[in-house]
Amino acid sequence: MIGRLAGAGGAVVLAILFAGCGIGASHEIVTFPPTSVGPAATVSAAVLQTRALIAAALAPLQIQLADAKDPFRPGESPRVAAAPRAVYQAVLPADPQGGQIVVYEFRDAGAAVDAGNELAGYLGTGAGRIQFPDDARWTIRQVGTTLVFYTWAPSTSPDPGSPKIADALATLGIGFTPPR
């Protein structure tokens, strides 16, 4: 009797498992958004204005600002990851892969401040820190409705211009400091 119940129970379990893989299962393929390469085809006026401010801040250092040619997406907090972005690159002769500056856009200045605080807090957590070298230096600046994010590390940034970019960006808008 117990053998029949066990056999019937096993058949019911198998039927449920197979039913879950059948018609009721989702056929949609889960995809992820592509990584950012340079600014979007249509960049807003706020992002263009922030780009102009960044270029002006870098000009005295004789560092040019270009559209990024390679995909780049740094570690981001959820609010920042969901925001529209444009990626630019400060041209560094000794570090052609470095100098990426990301400009995120938000609906208003308050939302940009909230996102800046969230990003700074995120970078202070284990989940945020593990995505960067131990000696990473972050620059987070709110400029109007945009948020500017730049990171560099002495251990991985061979160009002497890397810290100068951070210093130049520190002259823009309002800053946020991640906890150490």
Language-model segments: residues:
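Bacterial N-terminal signal peptides that target proteins for export
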Residues: M1-G10
